[in-house]
Each structure stands twice: as structure tokens, then as C-alpha cells.
From Swiss-Prot:
Alphabetically ordered keywords of this record: Cell cycle, Cell division, Cell shape, Cell wall biogenesis/degradation, Cytoplasm, FAD, Flavoprotein, NADP, Oxidoreductase, Peptidoglycan synthesis
SUPFAM superfamilies in the cross-refs: FAD-binding/transporter-associated domain-like, Uridine diphospho-N-Acetylenolpyruvylglucosamine reductase, MurB, C-terminal domain
Active site location: R172, S245, E342
Cofactor: FAD
Source species: Xanthomonas campestris pv. campestris (strain B100)
InterPro entries, A to Z: FAD-bd_PCMH (IPR016166), FAD-bd_PCMH-like_sf (IPR036318), FAD-bd_PCMH_sub1 (IPR016167), FAD-bd_PCMH_sub2 (IPR016169), MurB (IPR003170), MurB_C (IPR011601), MurB_C_sf (IPR036635), Oxid_FAD_bind_N (IPR006094)
Record's keyword annotation contains Flavoprotein: yes
Protein name: UDP-N-acetylenolpyruvoylglucosamine reductase
Presence of the UniProt keyword Cell wall biogenesis/degradation in the record: yes
Gene: murB
Length: 350
């Protein structure tokens, strides 16, 4: 059964979600709300079938583990427009709808001669999801280039324009993650430079550029290098169900880092997000505990990258979650370091 306002929104009952999550686990939405025109949100949310119900927003389902059926209503944004709304001498403002494919936006910006997003190429997901996690990779994070986040505030029942400061961005964090039931992101405006200093901090990118023969690398070359690396390291979700990196790299006080290095001299440490803080490699910790390439039933860790939880076929969300908990517990027992998941876990507690 479905209800709709022509061309603006559609509501479907008992909708299967297997095709809407990259782990390819079975789950069912009591109601699935597709939003074609964001301005229709207030009317759609007032529909009697879903009014007052919990909402779960799914982009491409690439940052969620459905460990059970989500309560209430699942919402998908289908607005996929990209517009350059302002040109300046050294930068442009690009607006993208929440339903735009993230990698598609990265490639579009490069085709327009704009830079900034190249290190974030091939990250799965949609534009609407990118501010929630403050997605990042290879030394860059999306908050560095966000101009405004356009959202619907369910508290005030108003559309709002939020500056980066109001978004409270942190390492894989934001106000949208801290208050998941308040804001519905409908579009994002990006401030993208025509030229900027390339981020080549990671040796892997420099090595890949050398392999490509890109001696005077530009932003498009960096994007291609990132694509090459990610395709080698990360399994294609269409072939092997996964959500990319499943665990966050732990941020710890410098004193705890020093104590760990005293016991484990070969432990790699990276600069933290703040003074007095360091970052550990979750992949290294997991690999040292012997989990890389292991599996139980159809739940496992990728053979290529220890951060990637994979579904080899028919694992349920609950089975994947149980396996991930085993991995995290073994790291805690050996290193006294607590691993946290990057994806949002639905239907169970971490």
C-alpha cells in the first residue's frame, strides 16, 4: 500500500531494505517515505501513518548497519540536483541536493575546475549523509569545504541554514550525529577553491602518483590516485557487502599513547585532532589481534583491509554486529583500547 502527493513525496508500507543498504542485510521498513521535493517535508511528515514516528534517513545505506528492523519510518531523499550558485575569482559555491551521489559530486566539481574534494573520492554515500559523519580520508575532511548545510529542524518545524560552526563538526562527528532525531539535511553548499594546496600527507598517495607518472600532480590526479588505492583496498559493496571502514581510529590522550608505546614499540601513532592527543590505527590493532581475513559463517573481516567488516553472502545484521563486537573486545583485552563503530547501528546497541 502506498500514499503520495504527485511528484513531491511517496509513502510505501512494509518496504524491503536489502537493496537500500550496502551490507545487503535483510530488514523491513514499516513505512518508507521518498521525498522528491524537500519543500514537501512538512506535509509528508504530517501524514497520519507516520506523524510523530521515529525517522531513519537512508542515503545509499553505506554508513548504517541494520541489526534489526528500524522502528517507525525510513526516509530517502531523491533530490539529486547540483548547481553552481556563485562564481568568484578564486572559488565557487556549489549546492547539491541531499540525494546526490557523493562520488558523483566529487567528479563533477573536478570537471568544473574546482578542487578541495579530491581526497574524498569514491567514498560511498550521498551528499545528505556527508556532514553527519563529517566524512574524511587521506588527511582531508568535508567540513573544510562546507559553506552551509540546509536542513529541516523538526523541533522548530522550520527550514534552517547552518554554518560550519553551528554544525559543531569534529572527528567523524557533528550536531547532526549528536542530535539524530532533530535535523533532516536537504542540501549542502560547498565552498570550493579553483586552486588550493594539495594534501599529499599520506605516503600511499605520493607513491600512487609516482606510479601514475604524475610528476606535476593536479587535483584530478590526486582523485585518481585515491580511486586506485580505494579500489585495491576496499571491496566493492556490489560484490561483497560492506560499509567501508567499520571502526573509527581511536583518539587517546598523549599519556595513554606513551604508555602503549612503551609496551608496544612498533605501534604506529598519528597526530590527534587536538593538542595533547594522538590517533591510533584501528586497522593495525585489529590485524595484530589476528582478525584480518577471518570469518564466522558469512560475517568476517576483509582480507585486504582490517577495518572493513564484510558480509560474504547471507549474514544477518545481528550476526555482523556480534562478529564486530568480538573484534572490538579482543582489541580491548590486549591493548585496553576501546573501538567504536563508524556506521550507525540500528535495531541494537553497540
Amino acid at each position: 500500500m502506498s500514499a503520495a502527493s504527485p511528484l513531491r513525496w511517496q509513502l510505501t508500507e512494509h518496504a524491503p531494505l536489502r537493496a537500500l543498504n550496502t551490507f545487503h542485510v535483510d530488514a523491513t521498513a514499516r513505512w518508507l517515505l521518498n521525498i522528491h521535493a524537500p519543500e514537501a517535508l512538512p506535509d509528508a511528515l504530517a501524514a497520519p501513518q507516520i506523524a510523530g514516528q521515529p525517522l531513519l534517513v537512508l542515503g545509499s545505506g553505506s554508513n548504517v548497519l541494520l541489526a534489526g528492523d528500524p522502528p517507525g519510518c525510513v526516509l530517502c531523499f531523491d533530490n539529486r540536483d547540483i548547481t553552481i550558485i556563485a562564481h568568484h575569482a578564486d572559488h565557487a559555491i556549489v549546492r547539491a541536493g541531499a540525494g546526490v551521489n557523493w562520488h558523483g559530486l566529487v567528479m563533477y566539481s573536478l570537471q568544473q575546475g574546482l578542487s578541495g574534494l579530491e581526497n574524498l573520492a569514491l567514498i560511498p554515500g550521498t551528499v545528505g549523509a556527508c556532514p553527519i559523519q563529517n566524512i574524511g580520508a587521506y588527511g582531508a575532511q568535508v567540513s573544510d569545504f562546507i559553506h552551509v548545510v540546509e536542513a529541516y529542524d523538526r523541533g522548530s518545524q522550520q527550514f534552517v541554514r547552518m554554518t560550519p560552526a553551528e554544525c559543531a563538526f569534529g572527528y567523524r562527528d557533528s550536531v547532526f550525529k549528536q542530535q539524530p532525531d532533530r535535523y533532516l539535511i536537504v542540501a549542502v553548499e560547498f565552498n570550493l577553491p579553483l586552486l588550493h594546496e594539495l594534501r599529499l600527507d599520506y605516503a600511499g598517495i605520493r607513491d600512487e602518483l609516482a606510479r601514475m607518472g604524475a610528476e606535476l600532480a593536479g587535483a584530478a590526479d590526486v582523485a585518481q590516485a585515491v580511486i586506485n588505492i580505494r579500489q585495491r583496498k576496499l571491496p566493492d559493496p556490489e560484490v561483497l557487502g560492506n560499509a567501508g571502514s567499520f571502526f573509527k581510529n581511536p583518539l587517546l590522550p598523549s599519556e595513554q599513547i606513551a604508555a602503549l608505546q612503551a609496551s608496544f614499540a612498533d605501534m604506529p601513532v598519528f597526530p590527534g585532532e587536538q593538542p595533547g592527543q594522538g590517533k591510533l590505527s584501528a586497522a593495525w590493532l585489529i590485524e595484530q589481534c589476528g582478525w584480518k581475513g577471518k570469518r564466522e559463517g558469512d560475517a568476517g573481516i576483509s582480507e585486504a583491509h582490517a577495518l572493513v567488516l564484510v558480509n560474504h553472502g547471507s549474514a544477518s545484521g545481528a550476526q555482523l554486529l556480534a562478529f564486530a563486537r568480538q573484534v572490538a573486545e579482543s582489541v580491548r583485552e590486549r591493548y585496553s583500547v576501546i573501538l567504536e563503530p563508524e556506521p550507525r547501528v540500528i535495531g541494537a546497541h553497540w
